[in-house]
């Protein structure tokens, strides 16, 4: 989907804003300074190449990226390698896994000078200096409007609806143990059903639920709305923003998000403890909060910028709302029970 408004926004922002923020270091030319910033991300990270090139030109640093996997894999790898860090800075730790990373002292404290006021609402409970919120979105079930119209079937609305016989063999989600959207969906079911969440998953399973490894598998392989993929599932786990990327020439979207099924996801970045280039890592964090990057996030990563002063693409206003009342689970409960919930899910749902 073309987003001309976003392109114009990015161009304007590039013309008038420093990409590395007010705290950017002098160009890294000294022999004693590292000249590479190693960035560790999840495998859905993407930004406009022109922005990355501009960061390198302005700071003198060379960016080097690695992506161990999805959000859950990213955090696991950061923990396993914390004594010999994979990089200098990491992006893509979400609120489901943040407590685990903080408990393992993976990150060093750093608060960007230009942290937007709106970011305060997404600070990690109890330790906002180690992780900086970068973007936010809602993980929700999505539906293929055309499929339901063709089959003369009402679209589901709630989590309960997904267990009804009318929707047997129609739903696909990603694995909570391997995928951050999958984990967000697990948390949504815990927030909605409390201690009955396992029974809910068992009803889903009995109704033909399909579980795959990653969000990419869900959306680009199994979802019927994916172009040319031959998917067979018209109900798929994705984001509330996904319908903004399936807009037709007449301005309508072929898909929709079920806003009563959503769990709020916040993605963070942080300077890795023991980083070889902490100054470069800090500069990259400042860069992620700069206006050009925040404006680029919607079109590249399906997420809302954490800076609420950034203008959104017009398509998002019409087709990509955040849920007015997302399902929630207290952060303290996630931190205390996440491993237990995942073990229970593995034992009683997957078997």
Describe every region a protein language model picked out.
Residues 181, 187-260:
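Ligand-binding pocket segment of bilobal, Venus flytrap-like solute-binding proteins
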Residues 142-147, 190, 265-280, 288, ...:
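A bilobed periplasmic-binding-protein/Venus flytrap-type ligand-binding module shared by bacterial periplasmic
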């Amino acid at each position: 989907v073309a987003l001309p408004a976003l392109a114009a926004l990015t161009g304007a922002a590039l013309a008038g804003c420093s990409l590395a923020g007010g705290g950017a270091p002098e160009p890294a030319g000294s022999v004693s300074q590292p000249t590479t910033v190693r960035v560790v991300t999840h495998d859905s990270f993407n930004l406009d190449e022109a922005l990355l090139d501009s960061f390198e030109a302005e700071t003198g640093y060379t960016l080097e990226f690695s992506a161990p996997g999805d959000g859950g894999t990213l955090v696991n790898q950061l923990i396993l390698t914390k004594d010999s860090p994979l990089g200098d800075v990491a992006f893509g730790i979400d609120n489901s896994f943040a407590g685990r990373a903080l408990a393992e002292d993976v990150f060093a404290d750093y608060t960007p000078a230009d942290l937007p006021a709106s970011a305060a609402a997404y600070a990690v409970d109890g330790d906002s200096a180690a992780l900086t919120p970068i973007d936010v979105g809602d993980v929700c079930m999505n539906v293929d409007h055309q499929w339901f119209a063709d089959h003369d079937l009402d679209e589901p609305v709630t989590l309960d609806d997904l267990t009804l016989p009318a929707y047997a063999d129609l739903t696909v989600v990603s694995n909570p143990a391997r995928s951050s959207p999958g984990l967000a969906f697990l948390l949504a079911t815990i927030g909605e059903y409390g201690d009955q969440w396992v029974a809910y998953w068992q009803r889903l399973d009995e109704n033909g639920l399909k579980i795959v490894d990653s969000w990419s598998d869900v959306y680009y392989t199994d979802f019927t709305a994916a172009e040319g993929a031959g998917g067979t599932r018209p109900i798929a786990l994705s984001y509330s923003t996904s319908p903004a990327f399936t807009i037709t020439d007449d301005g309508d979207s072929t898909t929709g998000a079920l806003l009563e099924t959503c769990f709020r996801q916040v993605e963070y970045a942080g300077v890795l403890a023991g980083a070889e280039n902490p100054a470069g890592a800090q500069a990259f964090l400042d860069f992620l909060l700069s206006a050009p990057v925040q404006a680029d996030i919607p079109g590249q990563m399906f997420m809302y910028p954490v800076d609420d002063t950034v203008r959104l693409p017009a398509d998002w206003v019409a087709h990509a709302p955040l849920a007015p009342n997302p399902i929630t689970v207290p952060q303290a409960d996630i931190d205390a029970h996440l491993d237990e919930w995942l073990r229970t899910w593995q034992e009683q749902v997957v078997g």
